[in-house]
């Protein structure tokens, strides 16, 4: 069974940077050793957003973006290697999620697309890459997401305590870790995505630092109620979503009935939408003893405060309190998934995704042995 140092690479729907994490992994442990966040250039971010918003593009443009992202991921990995004074031969493999540009797991031909050419990562790092984790699950009738609940269970499951793990990235997803029950999990709806999109359009800021802008506003209750009537929130699990659904266009359509709304009030309402839509799902599943939060949204004091207020009797804390950085959780999960793939172990949970069976996930892009010598 493959064990040793693995690198996880994650570029999520928030587009707030490429998260890269180094971890020692075997069948008994996942020990994080180092991490960094690598910036995404503005032109690449724009290209990704254009695709996710349904803007037309040529196959040449898509191919160029695929190549550029692969090179960017390689740069991020090499920066971590240099920081830690490591050589390619010191790393067993890289687990790279890629950048989701479209996720449509239902319909006549379900599909999901992550770009960032893994061949370029191998070529520029000299390290074996495991990627394309989601499409096997979709081929087996699953949603292809979320994949992190299996990792949450491995690291944070408890024999007696009823726990949930909440990841607030661009999209928020919930993992239900109940003793004696199959792990369940799904996307609850928007996490940071709409808040980030609004402040970017209004203030040219990538995110609302410390929720300072949202705190200046007041929740527009009719707008909140209108958004919460979106059918996604009432749909039953398994379910997953992404930027192709909850995007700036979605927000604009809801705002047409509220001309002249104060921009700060809209930001406050979007923060409340994230908190309320999550809290509703926590309660719908019977609540828990501890809600452990990770992802960029765990650093949003307004969202965290609202979750605590909406969920009395539940301990709401970040995964940092359990010794796992909330900023690195997803990248760490894909390092772990790479280890499972190389070990021939399944990476999905049918109880989460709805797939017909558990399966080894991903595709392996082997490094040239000469570069690893």
Swiss-Prot record:
Keywords: ATP-binding, Carbohydrate metabolism, Kinase, Nucleotide-binding, Transferase. PANTHER family: ANHYDRO-N-ACETYLMURAMIC ACID KINASE. InterPro entries: Anhydro_N_Ac-Mur_kinase (IPR005338), ATPase_NBD (IPR043129). Catalyzes the specific phosphorylation of 1,6-anhydro-N-acetylmuramic acid (anhMurNAc) with the simultaneous cleavage of the 1,6-anhydro ring, generating MurNAc-6-P. Is required for the utilization of anhMurNAc either imported from the medium or derived from its own cell wall murein, and thus plays a role in cell wall recycling. Belongs to the anhydro-N-acetylmuramic acid kinase family. Pfam families: AnmK. This is Anhydro-N-acetylmuramic acid kinase. The lineage of its organism: Bacteria, Pseudomonadati, Pseudomonadota, Gammaproteobacteria, Enterobacterales. SUPFAM superfamilies: Actin-like ATPase domain. ATP binds at residues 12-19. Its EC number is 2.7.1.170. It catalyses: 1,6-anhydro-N-acetyl-beta-muramate + ATP + H2O = N-acetyl-D-muramate 6-phosphate + ADP + H(+). It is an enzyme of class 2 (transferase). Pathway: Amino-sugar metabolism; 1,6-anhydro-N-acetylmuramate degradation; Cell wall biogenesis; peptidoglycan recycling. GO terms for biological process: 1,6-anhydro-N-acetyl-beta-muramic acid catabolic process; amino sugar metabolic process; peptidoglycan turnover. One of its GO terms (molecular function) is ATP binding.
């Amino acid at each position: 069974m493959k064990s040793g140092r693995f690198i996880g690479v994650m570029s999520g729907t928030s587009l707030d940077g490429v998260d890269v994490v180094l971890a020692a992994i075997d069948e008994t442990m996942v020990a994080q050793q180092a991490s960094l966040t690598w910036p995404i250039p503005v032109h690449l971010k724009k290209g990704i957003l254009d695709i996710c918003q349904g803007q037309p593009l040529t196959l040449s443009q898509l191919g160029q973006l695929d190549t550029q992202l692969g090179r960017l991921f390689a740069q991020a990995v090499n920066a971590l290697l240099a920081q830690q004074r490591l050589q390619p031969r010191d790393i067993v493999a890289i687990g790279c999620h890629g950048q989701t540009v479209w996720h449509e797991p239902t319909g006549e031909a379900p599909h999901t697309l992550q770009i960032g050419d893994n061949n370029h990562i191998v070529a520029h790092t000299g390290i074996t890459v495991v990627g394309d984790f989601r499409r096997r699950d979709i081929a087996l009738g699953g949603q292809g997401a979320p994949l992190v609940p299996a990792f949450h269970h491995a690291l944070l499951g408890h024999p007696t305590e009823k726990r949930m793990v909440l990841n607030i990235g661009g999209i928020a997803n919930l993992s239900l870790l109940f003793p004696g029950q199959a792990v369940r999990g799904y996307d609850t709806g928007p996490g940071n995505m709409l808040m980030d999109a609004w402040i970017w359009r209004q203030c040219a800021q990538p995110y609302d630092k410390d929720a300072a802008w949202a705190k200046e506003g007041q929740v527009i209750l009719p707008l909140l109620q209108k958004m919460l009537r979106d059918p996604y929130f009432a749909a039953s699990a398994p379910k997953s979503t992404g930027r192709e659904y909850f995007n700036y266009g979605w927000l604009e359509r809801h705002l047409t009935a509220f001309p002249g709304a104060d921009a700060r009030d809209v930001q406050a309402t979007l923060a409340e939408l994230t908190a309320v839509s999550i809290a509703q799902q926590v309660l719908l599943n019977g609540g828990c003893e501890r809600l452990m939060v990770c992802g960029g949204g765990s650093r949003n004091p307004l969202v965290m405060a609202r979750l605590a207020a909406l969920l009395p009797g539940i301990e709401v804390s970040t995964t940092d309190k359990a010794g796992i950085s909330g900023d690195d959780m997803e990248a760490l999960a894909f390092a772990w998934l790479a280890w499972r793939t190389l070990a021939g172990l399944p990476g999905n949970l049918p109880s989460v995704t709805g797939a017909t069976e558990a399966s080894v996930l991903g595709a392996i892009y082997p490094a040239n042995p000469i570069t690893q010598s």
